[in-house]
Amino acid sequence: MQGNKRRDTKPEMVVWKMLRELGFPGYRLDWKKAHGHPDIAYPGRKIAIYVMGCFWHRHEGCKYASTPKTHADYWEAKFARNVERDAEVRAAMEADGWQVVEIWECELKKDRIDETRERLRSEIEYAFIKM
């Protein structure tokens, strides 16, 4: 797994650019003071954005969430723990009053990026107004 980047991935960069284009600069990257180190955070507004890889985080119903055929037991356990940890992190963040936004890698593909941009704008605006 060493070859897999933990931060500054292409999907994250797409979301950074999207946020700037939408007029929401000023975010923090890989913010270490919050549960699970959100990929993108607005600490003052308590908004956490996680850019989730469909393969690693098991996006339900997504064609990119395939399971390797070799060492299936290993992969099943690894993926189950990833999903469990994601749920724990989300629950902890929400318990602390954070609004959690998850963006799946497949939602950044050309055919879905416009609807993803609109959903992101809507969720961020709501959080900005709510404060």
Give the location of each predicted region.
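Nucleic-acid endo/exonuclease domains
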Residues: 1-102, 106-131
